[in-house]
Amino acid sequence: MSQITEEQVKHVALLSKLEFSENEVKSFTDTFGKIIDMVEMLDEVDGEGVPFTMNVADNLNFMREDVAEKGLDREKLMAAVPEKEDGFIKVPAMLSDGGDA
């Protein structure tokens, strides 16, 4: 089994601003190790002569024409906002320290 450490899982969690219990860290460490093992197994598969497949399903991306449309009336929007600051809508902080990830 590939070695991914609990410290690595904790580091990624910290960068992602996520908090996990010790049981969750152990579980993620085991799961990520299994995923890495599976990817390494796929790396060993001989794909020589196998035709390249762009899409395993016959689905296509259907894109609409990009058409500019009139947006909301700023004055009406700002009148409906409960809290504003310097002309912007003020919302609660998503990050506890307010800093970068």
UniProtKB/Swiss-Prot annotation:
The gene is gatC. Belongs to the GatC family. Gene3D superfamilies: Glu-tRNAGln amidotransferase C subunit, N-terminal domain. GO terms for molecular function: asparaginyl-tRNA synthase (glutamine-hydrolyzing) activity; ATP binding; glutaminyl-tRNA synthase (glutamine-hydrolyzing) activity. Allows the formation of correctly charged Asn-tRNA(Asn) or Gln-tRNA(Gln) through the transamidation of misacylated Asp-tRNA(Asn) or Glu-tRNA(Gln) in organisms which lack either or both of asparaginyl-tRNA or glutaminyl-tRNA synthetases. The reaction takes place in the presence of glutamine and ATP through an activated phospho-Asp-tRNA(Asn) or phospho-Glu-tRNA(Gln). GO terms for biological process: glutaminyl-tRNAGln biosynthesis via transamidation; regulation of translational fidelity; translation. It is an enzyme of class 6 (ligase). Its EC number is 6.3.5.-. Keywords: ATP-binding, Ligase, Nucleotide-binding, Protein biosynthesis. HAMAP family: GatC. PANTHER family: GLUTAMYL-TRNA(GLN) AMIDOTRANSFERASE SUBUNIT C, MITOCHONDRIAL. This is Glutamyl-tRNA(Gln) amidotransferase subunit C. Heterotrimer of A, B and C subunits.
